Every structure is written in structure tokens, then in C-alpha cells.
Regions:
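Generic recognition of cysteine residues
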Residues: 1-3, 184, 190, 270, ...
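Terminal amphipathic alpha-helical/low-complexity segments used for targeting or macromolecular assembly
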Residues: 1-4, 9-135, 278, 283, ...
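Solvent-exposed, charged interface segments at domain starts and junctions
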Residues: 36-40, 44-47, 150-166, 217, ...
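Generic anion/oxyanion-binding catalytic loop in active/binding sites
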Residues: 55, 190, 273
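Short, charge-rich amphipathic segments
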Residues: 76-80, 84-90, 149-161, 198, ...
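Glycine-rich hexapeptide-repeat left-handed beta-helix
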Residues: 110, 116, 194-195, 200-308
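Glycine- and small hydrophobic-enriched segments that form the cores of compact globular domains
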Residues: 127-205, 210
Length: 308
């Protein structure tokens, strides 16, 4: 997905934060920041203390290097999805199934309460007994590959397509029409929403892309929320790697494709767009119908059209 900025934008800091004046020199994509150049490391953007996959993020390395190691991490993961005739490959499921205790169960005869998945409201009972941590895959969903891992209490709705490899954390929801194109890793209580396409991306816990989004080669921090129609462009028109310009200096990320990285609790408005290599710190806001410029936007930044 390619993007260029079309409208003038205004970048400002929300009043309760301060801008950092740190400077950067030119680095290669896999280099470690030098002494004092720490604003682009994972610790600036995320609290990883309770995340199940913290080893994706190397201490002291640039935050986007987690994407460099994503394929190896997921290729080496020990997947537990059973082989079962009730889970055919590459075709829509003919009937809903339940995953519980390492087994695939036909949903016929089970009682399923479709409450709020991310709050533990998906409840499956067998003759009145709750099957704790049961995951439900509805009829019409498509799984392509066995390297797919579901945590407990996950709901996959009809019409979703999940290509291996994929890891979906507990109490997450893959909604109708979602398209997971491979190497998608979602933490706990995430939403991969209706008509949302995700490719080679990382969701931390409670990250939500609920409606009509595109995420390629991107990272969502904990508690982030994408407004409907948010698009993360990940490929420049010009040849070469995505580069970041910060305080007049240029950083070569070493990546041909790099979408957006959103720090914890950052939000985007409906129909917002980010250019390749947009890095938003914690608690940022990208206003609706706004295109964010590439580069680093520090904690608490508000990005809006000048007309606002």
C-alpha cells in the first residue's frame, strides 16, 4: 500500500507533554542507537512487562527491528492447532467448531453465549458445564495452514480468512471479513476487525483495529485504537529503503517496507492515513481524515489538518 501526503497538516504537542530535542545521525537499519540516542527503542513506546512475546523486541535496538525478527520467531513457534476433519484447509468451515483441551469439538449440542469476547464474555457450555477457555470458530471462516495458534476464549467470525502463520492471543476477536495474510501476531484481547487486512504485523495486548483498516509491516502498542478506515501505507513510490528524517538527520531503517508504529494508548481517527515509516509515541492522536507525515512524532503529539 503506497501513500503520499495530499493536504497540509499541523503537528502539535498535547499540552501535558514536552517535545524531546534528542538528535540522531545516519544509521543502518539493524544498528543499535548510540549513547543517548534512545528515543526510538521499544522502551520509549511500549510497556512489555506483561506481554507474552517480549523477546521480539531487543533491548536497546530500534523499535522497528522487531519486524525483522518476526518471521523467524513465528517460524520457530510451537503451534498446537490439531489436525481434524472438522478443520479443513483452504475452504470455508461447513459448521462451527470449538477448540478446547487440545481437541476440536463440533458445536452442535454445545451452548454458546456470544458476549463481549475481549471481556471474557464468550462462554461455551456442554450440558451446562462451562468449558473454560474455549475458542469458537464460526461456520464460513477459512484457515489456510496448520501454523495457526489460538489462545483461550478467541472468537473467529464467519467470513474471516487466516493464513498461516498466525498467533491470536486469548480473548481476541477476528471479525467477519478480516483477512490475515500471514505473519500476524496478536496479543491478548485484540480486535482484528471487519474488512481489515493485516500482514506481517504485531499487536500488543488490547490493540484494536475494528473496521476497514489496512496494516502492513506495522506494530500497534497496548491499548491502541484505530478509527474506521485507517490505512498504514508501507511502501514508498521511490526505490530504496524507508528512511526517517529526524532533526535534520536521516536514519535508514533497512526495511523496504515499513508501515506505522504506534506507542501504547495512541489513537487514530476515522479515514486517517500514515505514510511509510510513521512512528508515533505513546498517547498520540491522529485526527480523522488526516495524513500523518513519515518520521518520529514524540509522546503526546496531536496531528491534525491545519483547517481544524
Amino acid at each position: 500500500c503506497r501513500c503520499v501526503r495530499e493536504k497540509p497538516i499541523s503537528v502539535e504537542l498535547l499540552p501535558f507533554f514536552h517535545h524531546s530535542d534528542s538528535t540522531f545521525r545516519t544509521f543502518s537499519g539493524n544498528a543499535m542507537p548510540t549513547d543517548g540516542d534512545t528515543m526510538l527503542t521499544a522502551a520509549t513506546f511500549f510497556d512489555l512487562s506483561s506481554y507474552q512475546h517480549p523477546h521480539l523486541f531487543v533491548d536497546g535496538a530500534y523499535v522497528w527491528t522487531a519486524l525483522n525478527g518476526l518471521k523467524r520467531y513465528m517460524n520457530d513457534f510451537a503451534y498446537t492447532l490439531p489436525e481434524d476433519p472438522l478443520l479443513p484447509q483452504g475452504v470455508p468451515l461447513a459448521a462451527p467448531v470449538v477448540l478446547h483441551g487440545g481437541k476440536v469439538l463440533a458445536a452442535d449440542g454445545l451452548q454458546i453465549h456470544y458476549g463481549d469476547t475481549t471481556r471474557g464474555g464468550l462462554i461455551v457450555r456442554d450440558s451446562g458445564e462451562i468449558l473454560a477457555g474455549a475458542t469458537v470458530i464460526m461456520a464460513g471462516a477459512v484457515l489456510l495452514g496448520r501454523e495457526i495458534e489460538f489462545g483461550g476464549g478467541v472468537l473467529v467470525e464467519s467470513g474471516a480468512m487466516i493464513k498461516a502463520p498466525a498467533i491470536i492471543g486469548e480473548m481476541s476477536e477476528v471479525r467477519q471479513g478480516a483477512y490475515l495474510r500471514g505473519y500476524c501476531l496478536a496479543g491478548r484481547r485484540c480486535i482484528l476487525g471487519h474488512a481489515t487486512e493485516v500482514k506481517h504485523s504485531i499487536f500488543l495486548d488490547d490493540a484494536k483495529a475494528g473496521h476497514f483498516a489496512y496494516l502492513g509491516d506495522s506494530i500497534l502498542g497496548a491499548g491502541t485504537n484505530l478509527g474506521a478506515g485507517t490505512k498504514f501505507a508501507n511502501l514508498r513510490f521511490l526505490p530504496g529503503n524507508v528512511t526517517l528524517r529526524i532533526n535534520g538527520e536521516r536514519i535508514d531503517t533497512g526495511r523496504r517496507k515499513l508501515g506505522a508504529i504506534l506507542g501504547d494508548n495512541t489513537q487514530t481517527g476515522c479515514n486517517s492515513v500514515t505514510n511509510p515509516g510513521t512512528i508515533l509515541g505513546r498517547n498520540c492522536v491522529l485526527m480523522p481524515n488526516t495524513t500523518a507525515p513519515s518520521g518520529y512524532h514524540s509522546e503526546g503529539t496531536l496531528i491534525s489538518p491545519k483547517s481544524y
